[in-house]
UniProtKB/Swiss-Prot annotation:
Protein name stated in the entry: Pimeloyl-[acyl-carrier protein] methyl ester esterase
Example of a GO cellular component annotation carried by this entry: cytoplasm
Binding site for substrate: W22, S82, L83, F143, L144, A145, L146, Q147, H235
EC number: 3.1.1.85
Gene (UniProt): bioH
Self-association and partners: Monomer.
InterPro entries, sorted: AB_hydrolase_1 (IPR000073), AB_hydrolase_fold (IPR029058), BioH (IPR010076), Carboxylesterase_BioH (IPR050228)
Family matches, as HAMAP family: Carboxylester
Entry superkingdom: Bacteria
Gene Ontology MF annotations: pimelyl-[acyl-carrier protein] methyl ester esterase activity
Catalyzed reaction equations: 6-carboxyhexanoyl-[ACP] methyl ester + H2O = 6-carboxyhexanoyl-[ACP] + methanol + H(+)
Functional summary from the UniProt entry: The physiological role of BioH is to remove the methyl group introduced by BioC when the pimeloyl moiety is complete. It allows to synthesize pimeloyl-ACP via the fatty acid synthetic pathway through the hydrolysis of the ester bonds of pimeloyl-ACP esters.
C-alpha cells in the first residue's frame, strides 16, 4: 500500500488536518503552520499523487478521501483549500464521526459552472486538461497566477505558490488531470445539506476561481453553516491574510 506523506506538529488538545489544493503540496501552509501549531496538534498532508505522496495514479474523490483518512487521527477539524475542500467535505459526508468541524477555504461544492450556478466554465477546465499534456509546468503556473490575481500582494503571493510547487517534484500528468476531472465533474451541493457538524466556509472577495456569488446561494442551501469573505483576498486568503485567517480557526476551536 502506498503511503500518504504526513507531518504532525504541536501539542494542542484539538487536531487540525490541512489539505492543500490542485497542483500543490503541504509546503503551501508554511506561512501559518508555526502559528497554528501553537494552538492545535497540526497535521500537514500531501494529497495522494502530490508532493511527497508518490506512487498514486489518478483517483476519484471518494478514493482520495479514503486514502487520506487511513492515516488520520480519530477525530479532527478538517480544513480543505480549493480541491482539498472537496476532499474534506467528502470525509465529512462519509465519516462524520471523525470530523469535529469542517472548514472549506476558497472552495466550492461544484467548481464547474452549471445552469444558474457560477463557477469555472467547463471549457476552461477542459482547456487546462488539454494543455497539461503539451506543457504541464507552464499550465500549472498559469493556474497559480489565476489564484492571486487582483490582490494588493498578487505578485508576491504568486511567487509563494510557485515556490511551493518547485520545492518538490511535479505531480505526474495523470494525477494533475485526475484532479482537474474532480473539479470539473463533482457536485456536492445537495449532499452537504446533510452535514450538521460545525461548518465554516471561508472565501476571498477577489477570487477568480470561486465566484463570491456562490456565497449567498450556499448560505441559503446550507443554513447550518457559517460563511466569511476576506475583503481583499483572492483564492489563497491564508497567504495574503495569515493573521486574520489563523484567528478565525482559533475562534472555531473554542466552539468544538
Amino acid at each position: 500500500m502506498n503511503n500518504i506523506w504526513w507531518q504532525t506538529k504541536g501539542q494542542g488538545n484539538v487536531h487540525l488536518v490541512l489539505l492543500h489544493g490542485w497542483g500543490l503540496n503541504a509546503e503551501v501552509w508554511r506561512c501559518i503552520d508555526e502559528e497554528l501549531s501553537s494552538h492545535f496538534t497540526l497535521h500537514l498532508v500531501d494529497l495522494p499523487g502530490f508532493g511527497r505522496s508518490r506512487g498514486f495514479g489518478a483517483m476519484s474523490l471518494a478514493d482520495m478521501a479514503e486514502a487520506v483518512l487511513r492515516q488520520a487521527p480519530d477525530k479532527a477539524i478538517w480544513l480543505g483549500w480549493s480541491l482539498g475542500g472537496l476532499v474534506a467535505s467528502q470525509i465529512a459526508l462519509t465519516h462524520p464521526e471523525r470530523v469535529q468541524a469542517l472548514v472549506t477555504v476558497a472552495s466550492s461544492p461544484c467548481f464547474s459552472a452549471r445552469d444558474e450556478w457560477p463557477g469555472i466554465k467547463p471549457d476552461v477546465l477542459a482547456g487546462f486538461q488539454q494543455q497539461l499534456s503539451d506543457d504541464f509546468q507552464r499550465t500549472v503556473e498559469r493556474f497559480l497566477a489565476l489564484q492571486t490575481m487582483g490582490t494588493e500582494t498578487a505578485r508576491q503571493d504568486a511567487r509563494a505558490l510557485k515556490k511551493t510547487v518547485l520545492a518538490l517534484p511535479m505531480p505526474e500528468v495523470d494525477v494533475l488531470n485526475g484532479g482537474l476531472e474532480i473539479l470539473k465533474t463533482v457536485d456536492l451541493r445537495q449532499p452537504l445539506q446533510n452535514v450538521f457538524m460545525p461548518f465554516l466556509r471561508l472565501y476571498g472577495y477577489l477570487d477568480g476561481l470561486v465566484p463570491r456569488k456562490v456565497v449567498p446561494m450556499l448560505d441559503k442551501l446550507w443554513p447550518h453553516s457559517e460563511s466569511y469573505i476576506f475583503a481583499k483576498a483572492a483564492h489563497a486568503p491564508f497567504i495574503s491574510h495569515p493573521a486574520e485567517f489563523c484567528r478565525m480557526l482559533v475562534a472555531l476551536k473554542q466552539r468544538v
